[in-house]
């Protein structure tokens, strides 16, 4: 899956929740996501994108920015 496609799907996911994200925003510091939000995002990733994230990649650093989340998903998609 292409990086831009993943990023756009993630943007749509957050927009559906009424969240606005600017490039490079720290999603934890801007209250876009919290620990429960990470779990919901992982479920979205598995159910909608068909990408299963290994528990080892579920670190705060991998979910801090939209770009980092997209990189994590792209790496996991093979």
Question: Where in this protein do the model-derived segments appear?
Answer:
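Terminal leader/tail segments of proteins
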Residues: 16, 64-65
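C-terminal structural segments of small proteins and small subunits
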Residues: 55-60, 66-76
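Two-component histidine kinase catalytic core, primarily the HATPase_c
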Residues: 37
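Phosphopantetheine carrier-protein modules
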Residues: 15-32, 51-59
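Thiotemplate assembly-line natural product biosynthesis machinery
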Residues: 1-20, 71-78
